[in-house]
């Protein structure tokens, strides 16, 4: 029985209790959210060491980190090092987007070592296996694709990105439009090439019930991918993007009817003033399904700093109702991220998520900031570092810039505003 079916039957599962504990909410609140589909708990029955987390309405905004090999860098050990960074940096989920090396072996090791939800994009592996075995990615059959989907699910993957909303009708609209970047989704581009070459409908759409049966078997959450997400600001919120979203909303209904949990993925590159509208349209068309956004990036001109452009957009998106942020690293649009890139990307997205949670009124969000303010007022450096979203970085900078442990920071020194004002207000801060 899936989490959704259990919730509808009135059962509060162990996973629901754990999510409630983490969120500081009642188990009944979580059960109701899962039952109606506004909350998902990705928790494959075969992911044995998972510490479940919930995404959705009324919960803290969550952060995903992407790792995985490429055709140029196939070392799974390096990706497992990234997984350690992902866990240490506090991400809530990780996606293995591997496209090189021993993909099955790497995925299984990531699942084995990950205590957070693991997601994948099965179509990557299906196309690559066909290229290697038959000499062409477009030699893939629908059976090939669903075999890989089941392989991922049976291994213990908690959620899968599937680009079900790209249909032949939608592609006709793309042809008529004047997009600058056309299709930037890797899975979306693979499917588009296959569909146009064969003149056939998207098997993930055409055989959606088959997909649901696999997810039902392992309690895998669907992450309905936005294969037509905008790849630049100029392409944002166009007809093709919205048409795909309409289809995804219809598929959310079908998944819920079957008892399969579903969330929806979103853009992408979006001008700041269009972000709220994108969230509101998704929440309406998809009937409150959790929204998982990539960024959104609010400008196209900042390669090397796209973790910042994504954090800006992610804050606005989450404050408007997005539930789950996919991190973007400084290496976005440039290359495979390093360990430090992964850490920076997670921290940028976590900052965005927390800033939005304050606006959302999430329990405990503002209190965290109040605790930091009190620690700063008291010049309590140990407490400030303890409360920092990245204590490791805060401690490092403090030690490097103030090795002698002076009470004030080296920015203000004897002219510390906290000390001066406290002196005249009769509220002398305690020495750290």
UniProtKB/Swiss-Prot annotation:
Alphabetized UniProt keyword annotations = 4Fe-4S, Iron, Iron-sulfur, Lyase, Metal-binding, S-adenosyl-L-methionine, Thiamine biosynthesis, Zinc
Could you state a single Gene Ontology molecular function term?
carbon-carbon lyase activity
* Gene Ontology terms: biological process: thiamine biosynthetic process; thiamine diphosphate biosynthetic process
Q: Name one Pfam family in it.
A: ThiC_Rad_SAM
Q: What is its EC number?
A: 4.1.99.17
Protein's pathway = Cofactor biosynthesis; thiamine diphosphate biosynthesis
Q: What class of enzyme is it?
A: lyase
Q: Which residues bind Zn(2+)?
A: 269, 333
Instruction: State what this protein does.
Output: Catalyzes the synthesis of the hydroxymethylpyrimidine phosphate (HMP-P) moiety of thiamine from aminoimidazole ribotide (AIR) in a radical S-adenosyl-L-methionine (SAM)-dependent reaction.
Its recorded name reads Phosphomethylpyrimidine synthase
Provenance organism: Desulforamulus reducens (strain ATCC BAA-1160 / DSM 100696 / MI-1)
Gene name in the database record? thiC
């Amino acid at each position: 029985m899936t989490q959704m079916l259990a919730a509808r039957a009135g059962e509060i599962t162990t996973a629901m209790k754990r999510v409630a504990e983490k969120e500081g909410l009642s188990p009944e609140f979580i059960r109701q959210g899962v039952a109606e589909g506004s909350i998902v708990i990705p928790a494959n029955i075969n992911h044995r060491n998972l510490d479940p987390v919930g995404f959705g309405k009324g919960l803290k905004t969550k952060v995903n980190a992407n790792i995985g090999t490429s055709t140029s860098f196939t070392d799974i050990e390096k990706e497992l090092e990234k997984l350690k960074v992902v866990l240490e940096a506090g991400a809530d989920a990780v996606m293995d987007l591997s496209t090189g090396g021993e993909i099955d072996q790497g995925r299984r090791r990531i699942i084995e070592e990950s205590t957070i939800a693991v997601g994948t994009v099965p179509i990557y592996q299906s196309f690559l296996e066909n290229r290697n075995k038959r000499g062409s990615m477009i030699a893939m059959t629908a059976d090939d694709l669903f075999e890989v989907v089941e392989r991922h699910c049976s291994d213990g993957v908690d959620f899968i990105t599937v680009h079900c909303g790209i249909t032949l009708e939608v592609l006709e609209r793309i042809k008529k439009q004047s997009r600058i970047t056309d299709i930037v989704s890797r899975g979306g581009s693979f499917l588009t090439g296959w569909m146009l070459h064969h003149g056939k409908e998207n098997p993930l759409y055409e055989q959606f019930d088959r997909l649901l049966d696999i997810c039902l078997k392992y309690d895998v959450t669907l992450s309905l991918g936005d294969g037509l997400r905008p790849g630049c600001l100029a392409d944002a919120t166009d007809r093709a993007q919205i048409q795909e979203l309409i289809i995804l909303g219809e598929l959310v209904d079908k998944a819920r009817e079957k008892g399969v949990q579903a969330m929806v993925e979103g853009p992408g590159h979006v001008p700041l003033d269009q972000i709220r509208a994108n969230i509101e349209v998704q929440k309406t068309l998809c009937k409150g399904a959790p929204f998982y956004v990539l960024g959104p990036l609010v400008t196209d001109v900042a390669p090397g700093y796209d973790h910042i452009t994504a954090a800006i957009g992610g804050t606005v998106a989450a404050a408007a109702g997005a539930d789950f942020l996919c991190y973007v690293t400084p290496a976005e649009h440039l290359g495979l991220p390093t360990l430090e890139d992964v850490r920076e990307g997670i921290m940028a997205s976590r900052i965005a998520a927390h800033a939005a949670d304050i606006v959302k009124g999430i329990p405990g969000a503002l209190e965290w900031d109040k605790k930091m303010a009190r620690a700063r007022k008291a010049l309590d450096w140990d407490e400030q570092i303890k409360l920092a979203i990245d204590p490791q970085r805060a401690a490092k900078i403090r030690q490097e810039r103030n090795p002698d442990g002076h009470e004030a920071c080296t920015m203000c020194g004897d002219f510390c505003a906290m000390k001066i004002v406290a002196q005249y207000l009769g509220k002398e801060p305690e020495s750290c």
